[in-house]
From Swiss-Prot:
Disulfide cross-links: none
Full protein name: ATP synthase subunit alpha
EC numbers on record: 7.1.2.2
Primary role: Produces ATP from ADP in the presence of a proton gradient across the membrane. The alpha chain is a regulatory subunit.
Taxonomic source organism: Coxiella burnetii (strain RSA 493 / Nine Mile phase I)
Residues at which ATP binds: G171, D172, R173, Q174, T175, G176, K177, T178
Gene: atpA
């Protein structure tokens, strides 16, 4: 005999089935592609889209909403767009662009969206972070007070860089801008500073050469390389610096120190100009859009030295008593030494100083070709290593006087003894400032070299033998007095006791060694 269900039971069964029925309703605004040209997609609809929101196209392709007009949206496609056609559907995602962050990225080469391109497999990280963030406020910042040694004598002596500073490297093409940045990254091997190198609009071969050099010198272990090469879409060249900055902020916000190199921001400005003109935004000076200053200011303001309270709040109390820093070394390429052009003046006004590389010095064999007269560090002086600060004394003034005398001596036939000595001393200082690439020096080595310069030991050395003298001195120190170098590196403060030790070692070298 079959059992019949009562009406109440039927209604209970239906109710329980409805409750168990799992369906997620997802509301998305859709639009239709009107046209595609040069990586710019115009979409009809998408009434709820936000500026900078990711827009989804068919075949897992994404774009960024840039122009919000009355009936349509102008979006820039991130990557290939040949498969997109008019009439296809575009959807809002409700998300802004995020990139992977974390320790797992160290030692890897990624593209402008954080995807690995070095053939070493996927990156083992689940953490992501938005590429656009608000820079830390004034209250959460700390003044720059800790040195970031570059290992280059001329920079650490005359234009010192501190952790959390923004120091511009500016000069014509082929004057050694990238070389300074790479040497600085190599020098962070034993400092614990994590490095991010962002290559924008460069040849693939140039980036490969940089990666190879970093690997040769054991610097790739603490470095992330972000590459948006010249062959990639303008959108990726525009986004790469922000992606690299987000990766650096991961370390800064957790009480660590990071260094980021943007090589170079001129190419990013070109990419943004291209996007803006294709979106038919009104052009301004040099055809750049009106918000080109904001492009770089919002990026470089994110480099900062943040205080303990900021780190503690960000990590929810997991990290206490530590400050974090992100130091930026943006690079700008000038045309025929014109530092008064639009982009160079913009970035000079945003940064905390600049290192100006002179093509004439470079061609004269003075490398790194730093023009001490035009280079300045506005906040790094407070962070300079104490012993170096004391030993260099009036180096800048001495060099300025030497250049003045050098110009004068070309017209004067006979010079008095004092002028001749000053000229000869200046020539020796210029020789000492020369430094081969990929050979950064420690604080201890630099301190002893500046002691030698300051106390006129070089005046007894022939001009053509100054480089040999320095090479022999460094070799002597590393072989026989490594303990003194270690002592200075560990505690780089000036004291009479340490100066006595340096004097004894230098006297021993001068008496016993040949060069």
């Amino acid at each position: 005999m079959s059992t019949q269900l009562r009406a109440a039971e039927i209604s209970d069964i239906i109710e329980s089935r409805i409750e168990k029925f799992g369906i997620k309703a997802e509301e998305r605004t859709e639009g239709t592609i009107l046209n595609i040209k040069d990586g710019i997609v115009r979409v009809y609809g998408l009434r709820d889209v936000m500026f900078g929101e990711m827009v989804e196209f068919p075949e897992n392709t994404y774009g960024l909403a840039f122009n919000l007009e009355r009936d349509s949206v102008g979006a820039v496609v991130m990557g290939p767009y040949e498969h997109l056609e008019e009439g296809m559907t575009a959807r809002c995602t409700g998300r802004i662009l995020e990139v992977p962050v974390g320790e797992a990225l160290l030692g890897r080469v990624v593209d402008g969206l954080g995807k690995p391109i070095d053939g070493k497999g996927p990156i083992d990280t689940s953490e992501t972070s938005p590429i656009e963030k608000v820079a830390p406020g004034v209250i959460t910042r700390k003044s720059v007070d800790t040195s970031l040694p570059t290992g280059l004598k001329s920079i650490d002596a005359m234009v010192p860089i501190g952790r959390g500073q923004r120091e511009l490297i500016i000069g014509d093409r082929q004057t050694g801008k990238t070389a300074i940045a790479i040497d600085t990254i190599i020098n962070q091997k034993h400092t614990g500073v994590k490095c991010i190198y962002v290559a924008i609009g460069q040849k693939q071969s140039s980036v490969a050469a940089v990666v190879r050099k970093l690997e040769e010198h054991g610097a790739m272990e603490h470095t992330i390389v972000v590459n948006a090469s010249a062959s990639e879409a303008a959108a990726l060249q525009y986004l790469a610096p922000y992606a690299g900055c987000t990766m650096g902020e991961y370390f800064r916000d957790r009480g660590q120190d990071a260094l980021i190199v943007y090589d170079d921001l001129t190419k990013q400005a070109w990419a943004y100009r291209q996007i803006s003109l294709l979106l038919r935004r009104p052009p301004g000076r040099e055809a750049y859009p009106g918000d080109i200053f904001y492009l770089h200011s919002r990026l470089l303001e994110r480099a900062a030295h943040v205080n303990e309270a900021y780190v503690k709040e960000f990590t929810k109390g997991k990290v206490t008593g530590k400050t974090g820093s992100l130091t930026a070394l943006p690079i700008i390429e000038t045309q025929a030494g014109d530092v008064s052009a639009f982009i160079p003046t913009n970035v000079i006004s945003i940064t905390d100083g600049q290192i100006y590389l002179d093509v004439n010095l470079f061609n004269a064999g003075i490398r790194p070709a730093i023009n001490a007269g035009l280079s300045v560090s506005r906040v790094g002086g407070a962070a300079q290593t104490k012993i170096i600060k004391k030993l260099i004394g009036g180096l800048r003034i001495a060099l300025a006087q030497y250049r003045e005398l050098e110009a004068f001596s070309q017209f004067a036939s006979d010079l008095d003894e004092a002028t001749r000595k000053q000229l000869e001393h200046g020539q020796r200082v210029m020789e000492i400032l020369k430094q081969p690439q990929y050979q950064p020096l420690s604080v201890g080595e630099m301190a002893i070299i500046w002691y030698v310069v300051n106390n006129n030991y070089l005046d007894q050395v022939e001009l053509k033998k100054v480089v040999d003298f320095e090479r022999s001195l460094l070799s002597f120190l590393r072989d026989q007095h490594q303990d003194l170098l270690d002592e200075i590196n560990k505690n780089p403060n000036y004291s009479e006791k340490i100066i006595e030790k340096i004097k004894a070692v230098v006297e021993e070298f001068v008496k016993t060694q040949s060069y």
